[in-house]
Regions:
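Sequence/structural signature of beta-propeller domains
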Residues: 1-164
């Protein structure tokens, strides 16, 4: 998106009780975190490699920010976030990080690779970012060498008020 604030591959959608739209992305794990050294020499599809992980977004449908996208959550490595669902009292948003490690399996000995990305700031200036990209996943334990597992996560406010 212009200005560098965007997403690709929208997937599951949910509406909260105020009518706001919630959305998760589903970019294949083998496409994520693929080096982009020169943005002008790759296809638009290959630019999806600049995305690090799948994510959840909040999109207000009324008010001064109507139609703008706001990042809400970033999924663990090599997962897709899905199953967006609010509790009846709107105090919990459930997400399911699904099939962690689908591309590289279990992360062994905290393995990672350094990769370079040609990015742009929100005002269009180019810069390079170097990432340490995990190879595989240990979600949800986050303990070295543990097998990855799908899970359900509930997100709540510390003050126990509705999410929105």
């Amino acid at each position: 998106a212009d200005g560098g604030a965007g997403w690709a591959n929208p997937d599951n959608l949910e509406l909260d009780d105020k009518g706001n739209l919630w959305m998760v992305t589903d970019i294949a794990s083998e496409v994520l975190n693929q080096p982009v050294i020169d943005r002008d020499k790759v296809s638009n599809s290959s630019l999806r490699g600049i995305y690090s992980n799948n994510s959840a977004w909040f999109i207000p449908t009324s008010g001064p920010y109507s139609g703008q996208s706001f990042p809400f959550a970033i999924g663990p490595a090599e997962t897709e976030l899905c199953g967006l669902q609010f509790s009846k009292d709107q105090r919990t948003l459930f997400l399911t990080p699904q099939h962690p490690g689908i591309f590289n399996g279990r992360r062994k000995d905290m393995a990672f690779e350094e990769r370079k990305f040609a990015l742009k700031t929100t005002d269009g200036k180019e810069f390079f970012q170097v990432r340490k990209v995990p190879i595989g996943s240990n979600w949800p334990s986050k303990e070295p060498n543990q097998p990855p597992r799908s899970s359900i996560v509930g997100v709540r406010r510390k003050n126990n008020k509705p999410i929105v």
